[in-house]
Structures are given as C-alpha cells and as structure tokens.
Amino acid sequence: LSKSVGVITVTVPDDSLVDQHPEFTAGTEVTLDESNTEIFVRSRDTETSQSAIARLGRQKIYIRAFVDKAKELYAEDAGYAAKLYQALTPYMVTNISQDRLVKLVQSIDQDKGYEEWTIPGEGIQGKEYDEYVVDDDALYEKTVETFYVEKK
C-alpha cells in the first residue's frame, strides 16, 4: 500500500510506540515509507491493556493521510486509480471491480468523502484478553441514524 503513494507524513498521536520505537513520540511529525509504515500501523504493546485501541487510532491517521495523498496523485494523473487497483490486486480479495474503484476515487476527489465512526462501547480487561464491550443502546441508535431514513 505504501509503495503505491510513496512517502506520507503524519503526526504521531500518542506515546504508545515510544518504548520500542523512540522516533514515534507523541506530537512528532514523521515521514512514513516502506521501512516504517508497518511498524506505525501494526505494532502494539501486548502487555498494555487496550493497546489495540491506540493502534486503531494510528491506523485511522494513516488511512486519512493515504487518502489525501491518493487524491493528490489522482489530481495529477486520472489513471492513478487504475494503477492503484493493479498494484493492490496481488494483496487483496474483493468483489469491487476496477471501474467501481475508479468511481470511488472520483467521489472522494469530489469531496463527497465518508463519515467515520466507531462502534460505541468501552475497552475492559477480561480474564485473559482485552475485551471491547459494546453499548447496545448507543449502537442501535447509531445504526438507525446511519442506515434508515424516516418516511415523510
């Protein structure tokens, strides 16, 4: 994925990686390339409860930066979306066609974008593993808000 856009610059959101990777200090602007992108998006301290939540935050930051960079590349070359699809094909299983991906990239380029949200709940320490307990009432409300339109 990182090869398809080149380097991406992000701001490190927290110190969750700093013990193993001092370059990832909270507030530091870092350039992600093939040598460090995987560390940024996949690493977590499995000895620290709820470290997966911090990792998810870094993944969201990476995806936003990736989309911004892809939009720039698409603005320079309308064929970029097709090139991206071809570059990703060996690493993915999808029913999204190349034409559909091109349309998705075009909609992002037109600032139609998307709304990002997290399933409401809280992380707790279980007997053996971290657990995420969903707030069922809040999830129901968010589901109705997101997927249903009131008849008038």
Write out the residue ranges for each language-model feature.
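Short, solvent-exposed polar/charged micro-motifs at secondary-structure junctions
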Residues: 1, 21-23, 126-132
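Stable alpha-helical elements in mature extracytoplasmic
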Residues: 1, 37, 58-62, 66, ...
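Flexible, polar/acidic helix-loop-strand segments at domain edges
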Residues: 3-79
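Sec-exported extracytoplasmic/periplasmic mature domains
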Residues: 3-10, 46, 64-75, 89-93, ...
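C-terminal solvent-exposed extensions
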Residues: 32-33, 91-152
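Second-shell loop/turn segments in exported
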Residues: 45-54, 70-75, 87-94, 126-137
